């Protein structure tokens, strides 16, 4: 056992040992490195798999009662200052090591096929290995200073991968946006670290918390200063985990390759913020005001992310807002002192979200040969539909992830989300209402994405048919039960009609064209319209390769069974679960009422499952493949009520589609404000700061030139100067006698 702990540093070193030679080879021997690129990929997968094996070994040692292990070596030593580096192995570290290495290995296997067509394949694996190494280094860090070093390395890798296709302007802008947004949080994190070091004289987690509690007990430090330092420290996780109001970078981060989106959203960058709050939980717990702030930031983020996911047409952006919402759940759980449940949801969400992102990558990979390699088309759900028939394994695994994130038992996220809903309700009715409403929205938008992507007919054929001047009806992204005669001449216009951006909720009756090659029938006042089917020759997507399907199947299995670690077991009237045994040291601020038997547990779970099914039902009504419309009922609808409903729904739609207008506010207040301030500062510097010395210099130049001309030895100049002086004297004499007679 001692041997395993002693060499735990090898875990982050293994992916680093693959990243460095790949990167150096790409710089100095690009041709030779690219010629054996598959070999480098296999080496990367093998080394990370070894790291995963070691992580499981450390994990088993911890959950079977192994001791917490700390190892330090001194880097800088003098009389007043010492700096130690090392690693820390405890239950939190071991769980995160397993999480990062398992998801990272699956992403690497997946990327080998997904990125095979890309000429920057080698550079991608160099970044990917370094990304995994940085996150693993962050996880095992024993002090704040070492965490900050790896925190910045994780950020740097994420910026490199978000802007991986930097020749694309949108990717370059997304990279800059992520960098600038995270600068605000990271600067606060650095100030908070330095502030706590000034107070306690240490960067180590355990000593930091103990010393702070001692100083607080004897009033040795001001509460305002400590709270301010904790707030600055919390800014780092707010930015890194995309919490309100520093969340704006996360949706734009979808410009990176899809495997990176899976890694960022599941196990690395956004998980780093939650991990840091969990690591510093004893410190934050001693400050009630900060805990209250953490809970409110989490609650607002959860609700805001869910509302902004409702109207997204881009598959990956919809999943990005879903991640933002789920991270809000975790932060809320930490804020209400549900430490174990927050980490439980971090684990279940990681595997479910990795599955969903890799599934979306499989869809995009199959759509690109048909619609082109532009993200606006290959990721546009308006051009998808019916993919389950052509990609059954991808469709089934995506459905598993959708059910899990929606909170449907027995999938992973149900067990963790249900406990968050229960604890938040016990803590505060306001937080209970936020989490329950968000749970319903989550089920709605997740099934909306699934139905638009995998059910119905393949809608690219509608665009192709339209380009051949065949009249079609549009399929609204909001389940709009209408048909329009499309008379535009571009496929993009067709896509805009499919999205239904302007009149997304109108309930006009179907105007079925005589030229439409569809089927319809009337039955009891209902019009049943079957999806359009064109008999011509069209291209259809096909299932991805085995290298991409294998990670989907493995993550699907994790999604089915990983929730068992938090499932309660009742014995002798007591409640047990595996995860609680791993985090036996965590305490609660008050006695939370937990169910005492299975029947009580299921009764408590009924409302959360019910609201999830309600969201799914609404999504199925709006986005089902076959559309039903009662014409008689619709025509009898009160027109005033219809106008009010349409206006209300359009407000909700615009709020969601334009991301709650937050980006617009930031553009007006921050970006344009800073640019205006910079222009004003530049003008002041140019005309005032530089203008005064430059003006004096120019004045001296002109005076000197004038004196040079006067003293040049020319008689005409002397005469002119003499006459000029006489004239000035006469004028002065005349005006002086005029004013003073």
Curated annotation (Swiss-Prot):
Report the membrane topology from the UniProt record.
Answer: Multi-pass membrane protein
Which Pfam families does the protein's record reference?
Answer: Proton_antipo_C, Proton_antipo_M, Proton_antipo_N
* Superkingdom of source: Eukaryota
| Coiled coil (residue ranges) | none
TM helices/strands, residue ranges: 9-29, 40-60, 89-109, 124-144, 147-167, 185-205, 218-238, 258-278, 286-306, 327-347, 354-374, 395-415, 427-447, 550-570, 601-621, 651-671, 687-707, 719-739
Query: Where in or outside the cell is it found?
Result: Plastid, Chloroplast thylakoid membrane
Question: What GO cellular-component annotations does this UniProt entry give?
Answer: chloroplast thylakoid membrane
Which EC number(s) does UniProt give?
7.1.1.-
Which InterPro entries does UniProt cross-reference here? NADH_UbQ_OxRdtase_chlpt_su5_C, NADHpl_OxRdtase_5_subgr, ND/Mrp_TM, NU5C-like, Proton_antipo_N
Q: Name one GO molecular function term.
A: quinone binding
Instruction: Provide this UniProt record's keywords sorted from A to Z.
Output: Chloroplast, Membrane, NAD, NADP, Plastid, Plastoquinone, Quinone, Thylakoid, Translocase, Transmembrane, Transmembrane helix, Transport
Physiological role: NDH shuttles electrons from NAD(P)H:plastoquinone, via FMN and iron-sulfur (Fe-S) centers, to quinones in the photosynthetic chain and possibly in a chloroplast respiratory chain. The immediate electron acceptor for the enzyme in this species is believed to be plastoquinone. Couples the redox reaction to proton translocation, and thus conserves the redox energy in a proton gradient.
Per the record, the similarity remark reads: Belongs to the complex I subunit 5 family.
Subunit organization: NDH is composed of at least 16 different subunits, 5 of which are encoded in the nucleus.
Q: What is this protein called?
A: NAD(P)H-quinone oxidoreductase subunit 5, chloroplastic
Q: What is the lineage of its organism?
A: Eukaryota, Viridiplantae, Streptophyta, Embryophyta, Tracheophyta
State the encoding gene.
Answer: ndhF
